[in-house]
Amino acid sequence: MSQQRILPQSKETLLQSYNKRLKDDIKSIMDNFTEIIKTAKIEEEHQVSRSTQGEQDNYEMHVRSANIVRAGESLMKLVSDLKQFLILNDFPSVNESINQRNQQLRTLREECDKKLIALRDDIAIDLYELEEEYYSSSYSVCDPSDLPLCEVYWNRESTASSPEDLSVPLAPIMAEASTVTSQIHTPPHLNGHGAGMTEHT
């Protein structure tokens, strides 16, 4: 970071303990490795027998090797603790990650809104062409004073002020279309109990 932040006392103490652990573990590895190298050196004169000295050197090398392994494991644990410390306390990085994710979601929402608007316009154009074809055909029995479905649709859309208003249900429009279709296919009543179609003079 370009600017060093002022840490609370507890965090400062924790970082100091991490630094001390790092130095102690590295020193332990270096000292034990140095002693292992010294033990490997063959000396000419011994106060004890050569077999006894060999067993002693073997035991010392095992102990110092175990110390090196233990210091290495402590360093790995220190790395894990440092990662956890950064994750839990590096708030600027966390906030930056959150802001980037929010920006990605906003971009995705804008793209979805544009696609929905384009889909709405395509549906409206197709609906207008279908209505023009239907009302100009000889099968239309609708009242000329009735509004076409496309005009009803656009009247509804003219009241929408945001992309969220695209969720207006089309059920009333479809119900009106089904009513018009039923008027075409419903035969006149011939039993005298219902009103038939008006005869043309």
UniProtKB/Swiss-Prot annotation:
Coiled coil region boundaries: 93-123
Signal peptide annotation: none
GO biological process: regulation of transcription by RNA polymerase II
InterPro entries: Med22
Subcellular location: Nucleus
PANTHER family: MEDIATOR OF RNA POLYMERASE II TRANSCRIPTION SUBUNIT 22
Protein name, as recorded: Mediator of RNA polymerase II transcription subunit 22
Organism: Xenopus laevis
